[in-house]
């Protein structure tokens, strides 16, 4: 069977394929334009970041740049300068994707030379197409974005402004980027560095930093979390709950209502450690120390003993109890036996070391009291004998006896101490007759 419509089918298939190919080519063009646009937007963001860093640098160094620029001679800011001063990260490249290098040209305003204005210009590398320049000029967010199309003039986005590059001492070529930083923009940057912000600004810690002294005009600084400082001078009182100091605390005087605790020593160079109200020094660990509770005596806390390997020296030393010595009692001054003394009961020594005591107002040797003679008499047949006894409290130190008879013949046959306080003696007449004896006891 003949097929009369076969040619028309082939024609329809070819037309469909042609349409598909046209759609693919059109879509590829749109995709390529999209990729280009995204790339130019990225370039615009990089230029915005660079311009923002230059703006901050100018604000920070406003006075310095005023001194290094004129209305026709610019101060030039480079990428290296921004990286070295921390306004750009160290990884920021010196050139963009087309090999162009950004620089800022800062000059004084011709109408008001006290103010600055600047132009950011790219130079070198490969020129951008006009479409890219127009797109990037609109997407730049810092300053007034623009471009250079004739190599001499910077033109703003949507042709909103136009400035000759020579006004800024800048040079470039066709197909390059330009950003205008007006006098008002840079004045705001300078104010940013001078103004102390109440809130944190991300990426701008310098806005919360003082660069000079602040005068509160006798007003308060309230609700401070922490004060970190190198030194502090106060003409009045400093009140607080706790204080920690890693170094020294100095002052003319200090008053504390409760306790002062130190981890180390407490020293006074030329003053006293003064306490009041019957208080003094106390060792908390062992419960000892010194205090005064009257105007006469320094007392030991809890009646603790005082121990030293050195000397304890004073005008007088009094013991209400016994006085002990682990060695000897050394009396340095001497007295003379027979000399007057007061009061009775004093103990001393003479120059030979003999012990003296004050008795009845006179220095006497110990054991050498007043002598007293005790006597006893007896009469008996041929062998008379007797014993003389000392008064109470006296001791016998010697003695003897005397014998007598009618005929004169009699002998002292015995004479001896018969006890600690008596002396005995006896006689012999050798004849049958009576004899008499008198016995003497020397008592002291």
From Swiss-Prot:
SUPFAM superfamilies: Enolase N-terminal domain-like (SSF54826). Residues 1-361 are annotated as: Constant region. Residues 362-444 are annotated as: Variable region. It comes from the Bacteria. This is Shufflon protein B'. This protein is expressed by a shufflon (= clustered inversion region that works as a biological switch). The orfs of this region share a constant N-terminus, while the C-terminus is variable. Pfam families: Shufflon_N. Keywords: Plasmid. InterPro entries: Enolase-like_N, Shufflon_N.
């Amino acid at each position: 069977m003949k097929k009369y419509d076969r040619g028309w089918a082939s024609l329809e298939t070819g037309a469909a394929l042609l349409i598909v190919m046209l759609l693919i080519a059109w879509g590829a063009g749109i995709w390529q334009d999209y990729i280009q646009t995204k790339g130019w937007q990225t370039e615009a963001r990089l230029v915005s970041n660079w311009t923002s860093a230059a703006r901050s640098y100018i604000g920070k160094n406003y006075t310095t740049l005023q001194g290094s620029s004129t209305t026709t001679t610019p101060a030039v800011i480079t990428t290296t300068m921004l990286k070295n001063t921390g306004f750009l990260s160290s990884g920021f490249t010196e050139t963009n994707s087309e090999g162009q290098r950004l620089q800022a040209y800062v000059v004084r305003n011709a109408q008001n030379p006290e103010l600055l204005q600047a132009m950011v210009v790219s130079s070198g590398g490969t020129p951008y197409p006009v479409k890219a320049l127009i797109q990037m000029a609109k997407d730049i967010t810092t300053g007034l974005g623009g471009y250079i199309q004739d190599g001499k003039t910077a033109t703003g986005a949507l042709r909103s402004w136009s400035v000759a590059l020579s006004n800024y001492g800048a040079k470039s070529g066709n197909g390059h980027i330009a950003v205008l930083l007006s006098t008002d923009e840079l004045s705001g940057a300078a104010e940013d560095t001078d103004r102390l912000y109440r809130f944190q600004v991300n990426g701008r810690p310098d806005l919360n930093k003082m660069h000079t002294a602040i005068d509160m005009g006798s007003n308060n600084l309230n609700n401070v979390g922490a004060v970190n400082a190198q030194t502090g001078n106060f003409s009045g009182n400093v009140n607080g709950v706790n204080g920690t100091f890693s170094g020294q605390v100095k002052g003319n005087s200090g008053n504390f209502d409760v306790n002062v605790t130190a981890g180390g020593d407490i020293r006074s160079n030329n003053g006293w450690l003064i306490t009041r109200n019957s208080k003094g020094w106390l060792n908390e660990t062992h419960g000892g120390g010194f205090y005064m509770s009257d105007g006469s005596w320094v007392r030991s806390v809890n009646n603790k003993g005082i121990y030293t390997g050195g000397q304890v020296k004073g005008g007088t030393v009094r013991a209400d109890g016994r006085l002990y010595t682990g060695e000897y009692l050394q009396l340095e001054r001497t007295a003379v036996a027979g000399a007057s003394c007061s009061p009775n009961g004093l103990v001393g020594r003479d120059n030979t070391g003999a012990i003296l005591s004050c008795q009845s107002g006179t220095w006497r040797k110990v054991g050498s009291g007043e002598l007293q003679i005790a006597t006893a008499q007896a009469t008996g047949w041929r062998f008379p004998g007797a014993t003389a006894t000392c008064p109470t409290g006296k001791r016998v130190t010697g003695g003897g006896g005397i014998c007598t008879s009618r005929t004169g013949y009699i002998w002292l046959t015995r004479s001896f101490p018969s006890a600690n306080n008596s002396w005995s003696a006896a006689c012999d007449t050798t004849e049958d007759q009576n004899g008499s004896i008198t016995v003497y006891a020397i008592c002291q």
